Amino acid sequence: MAPNTDIGLIGLAVMGKNLVLNMVDHGFSVSVYNRSPAKTEEFLKDHGESGALQGFTTIQEFVQSLKRPRKIMIMIKAGAPVDEMIASLLPFLEEGDILIDGGNSYYLDSEQRYVDLKKEGILFVGMGVSGGEEGARKGPSIMPGGNIDAWPAIAPIFQSIAAQVDGRPCCSWIGTGGAGHFVKAVHNGIEYGDIQLICETYEILKTRLNLSLEQIGNIFFEWNQTDLNSYLIGAAAAVLIAKDENGNAIASTILDVAGQKGTGRWVAEDAIKAGVPMSLIIESVLARYLSTWKEVRTKAAQEFPGIPLLCQPPQEASAFIEDVREALYAAKIISYAQGFMLLKQVSQDKGWDLNLGELALIWRGGCIIQSAFLDKIHQGFENSPEAHSLILQDYFKKVLFDSETGFRRAVLHAIGSGVAIPCLSSALSFYDGYRTVDSSLFLVQGLRDYFGAHGYERRDCPRGEFYHTDWLETKKTFRV
C-alpha cells in the first residue's frame, strides 16, 4: 500500500497540473483527482515516474490517501462547481481537515464557505494564486486567507512553491474570511488598469509618431530598463516585436476584441459599493466591453471621421516619447494608489487589518503585475503608513510633481488628435480632482436640495450639520 501523501489537488487543468508539478519539484507528495479519469490517467502517465504522485478515480479513495490533517486544494471553475465539490468531499472529511479553494472565486462566496465549513469543523482557506501557467509551474504569487488555524499546516508547502524575491517567498497570510480572494481580485483589477494604460500608450505612439509595431515594441523594451520595469511591459514588448515564420508581425493579425473572466468587473463593483473612486480600473473594464462592439465601431468610424485639432506630429519625437513615458508612469502610480485605497477601505470595513506593505512584497514576483515599482510601494508604506494614499507618500509625490508637465502634454496630444485614452485621461482627472480644495460638487448638493430636499452641509458650519433652503419661495435656510 502506497504511503499517504502530503497534499491532494482536485482539477487537472493547466493551473492545477503545474501546481502539482511545482509541489513535487519541492519534495512534496501529491494525490490528484479529476472528474475525468482519463485526464488523471494521462497526467500520471506523463509525470508519475517519480513516485511522488498518486491518482484516484473516486473522491473517497482520494481523501483516504492523504496524511492527517488532510490538505485538499481545489482548482476548478469558480461558483457552483466549487460548492458541489465541497459537498462531495464533506462526507469523507474529519474535524481539522483543510479545504483550499485556489480558483478565482468571488470573495463573498469565500466568506460564506469559511463560515459554513467552520460549523463543520473544517478549516477553509480561500487562496488567490497569480502568475498564470508559468507562475504555477515555476513559482506563483500566493494570497491565502480564511481560517488562520490552517496556516501552520499549509505554510511549508505554499511558501516553498511560491516565487522567491530577495530570499522571501511571495506568499504570506492575508487575513480572515475572504481576504485572500479579495486581495487577488484587486490584483486582477490593477492588472486590468496596467494593461489598458499600456494599450493607450501604444496607441498614442502609433498615431502621433506613425511608429510600427516593432518600433513601439523596442521603445517598450527600453522602458523596461527604467522605473517602468515590469512583467507586463516586457510582455508587451515581446508581443509587439514577435514575427511569424514569414517575417510578418503576429500582433497585426490579432482582432481588437478583448476578453475578460469577470474579476475586473467584480472589483469595479466592489469599489463602487465601498465608495472608493477606483476610476482607472472601472474605465479599463468598460474599455473591454466597448471593444466587443467591433461591428458598431466599424460603422461609427465611417459616420464620424473625427475633427482632430492636432494634425501635425510632435516636432521632437524623442521628447514626446519621454512625455508619454512620464504619462504612463504617473498614471500607473494613480492606478495603484486607487487599488490600495480600496484594499485599505475594505480591510477597515471587514476588520481584516491587511498589511498593505506586505501585499506589495507578495506581488513582486510570480504574478502578472510583478514590477520593480512594488518595492517603492512597500517602502512608502513602511515610511509613511499614515498617508491617505500612495499619492501623498514622498517618492510618489516627487514623481507626480516632476512628470505632471509631460503627462499633460501627452494627454493633450491624444485628445487633440482624437485618440481614445479612457485610463490616461481618467488618471489625470483623478489627480486634478484629488488636489482640488473647492470643487464644483457644491452644486450637486444644491441641486439635490432643490429638487429633493436632501439638505447640505455649509462651508461656515461644522461638518455633520445639515441645512435646507426654501429655493422656490422664501429662499430662507434653516438647519434640519
Curated annotation (Swiss-Prot):
Substrate binds at N104, S130, G131, G132, H187, N188, Y192, K261, R288, R448, H454. It catalyses: 6-phospho-D-gluconate + NADP(+) = D-ribulose 5-phosphate + CO2 + NADPH. It comes from the Bacteria. The active site is at K184, E191. InterPro entries: 6-PGluconate_DH-like_C_sf, 6PGD_dom2, 6PGDH_C, 6PGDH_Gnd/GntZ, 6PGDH_NADP-bd, 6PGdom_BS, NAD(P)-bd_dom_sf, Pgluconate_DH. Its EC number is 1.1.1.44. Keywords: Gluconate utilization, NADP, Oxidoreductase, Pentose shunt. SUPFAM superfamilies: 6-phosphogluconate dehydrogenase C-terminal domain-like (SSF48179), NAD(P)-binding Rossmann-fold domains (SSF51735). It is an enzyme of class 1 (oxidoreductase). SMART domains: 6PGD. One of its GO terms (biological process) is pentose-phosphate shunt, oxidative branch. NADP(+) binds at G11, L12, A13, V14, M15, G16, N34, R35, S36, I76, K77, A78, N104. One of its GO terms (cellular component) is cytosol. One of its GO terms (molecular function) is phosphogluconate dehydrogenase (decarboxylating) activity. Belongs to the 6-phosphogluconate dehydrogenase family. PANTHER family: 6-PHOSPHOGLUCONATE DEHYDROGENASE. Homodimer. This is 6-phosphogluconate dehydrogenase, decarboxylating.
